[in-house]
């Protein structure tokens, strides 16, 4: 598919939408992001990114996408997205570039590679928004590199799983310049609710704390199910009973029914969760923190990888506990 290239004036002649606003705060209230004045780039069209990007296209934004496996972007292309052959090419055609990829090494490559990275193609005043769960130190590094080029960078990882992405109900943890985060709200609001957490890297710190909480919550959920099963309870009725009490949680809402149906399709991959928990543990070591629940959850999720189950969803933690106890949890409806 041919690229739809636009001709831009030299940055020395005219600055971008964001740079104009950073220099003239009086225009902030009137110069709001709209589909007519802001071009979007999107890098990473997996389980989460595909739905998130789709909301922007549906809202009328011109979007250029890049994904290493182009077939994973086909749905977006069918919706009207342009396709580029590199992150650099995406940035050349965009005012705001979003990324949501797998690992910190992927983030570094797609954003900071001197030849093919998005930052190398971004014009003065452009904005990078990394929505990958990654290392806080890398977010700080990207922000410094962007600032050196008179650009902006926001770390904005998300929580809410595939259903949150599909329904535009994600929780977004944003770190970076607060004014820039506020300017991006017309875009963030299409994907969920943005929460400003502080300076660059603080969005990543918040997401890592979120993952620590999720790990313990998921472990409690599957342990409770195994105990209820062994005690002879109807696990479906058990889940219904606890969901409205003090044990109710987002994990039950999102994954309880899937677990009962033994539906382990990924809303969020075990492989990626292991990566997240590994980053958490590294940060804990750096901070001098001992979080035994986090360490235990990491070991159990690593056991799923060892059994070739890394491409299942995080609710597959049930399988690790079933093997440990030689049981198989079944709903009466199964």
Curated annotation (Swiss-Prot):
It holds the Pfam family NAD_binding_11. Its EC number is 1.1.1.31. The active site is at 207. This is Probable 3-hydroxyisobutyrate dehydrogenase-like 1, mitochondrial. It comes from Arabidopsis thaliana. The modification N-acetylalanine is found at residue 24. Residues 1-23 form a transit peptide. PANTHER family: 3-HYDROXYISOBUTYRATE DEHYDROGENASE-LIKE 1, MITOCHONDRIAL-RELATED. GO terms for molecular function: 3-hydroxyisobutyrate dehydrogenase activity; NAD binding; NADP binding. NAD(+) binds at residues 38-67, 133, 275. It is found in: Mitochondrion. It catalyses: 3-hydroxy-2-methylpropanoate + NAD(+) = 2-methyl-3-oxopropanoate + NADH + H(+).
